[in-house]
Swiss-Prot record:
Protein name per UniProt: Nitrogen regulatory protein
Alphabetized SUPFAM superfamilies for the sequence: Phoshotransferase/anion transport protein (SSF55804)
Keywords tagged on the record: Cytoplasm, Kinase, Transferase
Record comment regarding domains: The PTS EIIA type-2 domain may serve a regulatory function, through its phosphorylation activity.
InterPro entries per the UniProt record, alphabetical: PTrfase/Anion_transptr, PTS_EIIA_type-2_dom, PTS_SugarTrans_NitroReg
Residue ranges constituting the PTS EIIA type-2 domain according to the UniProt record: 6-89
UniProt subcellular location: Cytoplasm
Classification via PANTHER family: NITROGEN REGULATORY PROTEIN (PTHR47738:SF1), PTS SYSTEM FRUCTOSE-LIKE EIIA COMPONENT-RELATED (PTHR47738)
Known role: Seems to have a role in regulating nitrogen assimilation.
Length: 89
């Protein structure tokens, strides 16, 4: 059984993160994940997130989005939770 605390760890849960733009926010997500998950490369995570976003926005409005993608190098689900200083639409 996969447990939530292995998918979303305290090290991948950040608040008051500077965002500025969608691209910068995705870069930050990719950096946080790659820093915490050694088998994943930041650039690969970032490129996959951007490619997924090009298929259609993962934003819900009101500053909420759930960017996601599939990563070949990941053997288990991985997530990060970032609360930005200011919402991005």
């Amino acid at each position: 059984m996969i447990r939530l605390e292995t998918i979303l760890t305290p090290g991948r849960s950040l608040v008051n993160v500077p965002g500025g733009s969608k691209k910068r926010a995705l870069e930050k997500v990719a950096t946080v994940i790659a820093d915490q998950v050694p088998e994943l490369e930041m650039q690969d995570v970032f490129e996959k997130l951007v490619a997924r976003e090009k298929l259609g926005s993962t934003g819900f409005g009101n500053g909420i989005a759930i960017p996601h993608c599939r990563l070949e190098g990941s053997s288990a689900p991985v997530s990060a939770l970032l609360h930005l200083e200011a919402p991005i639409d």
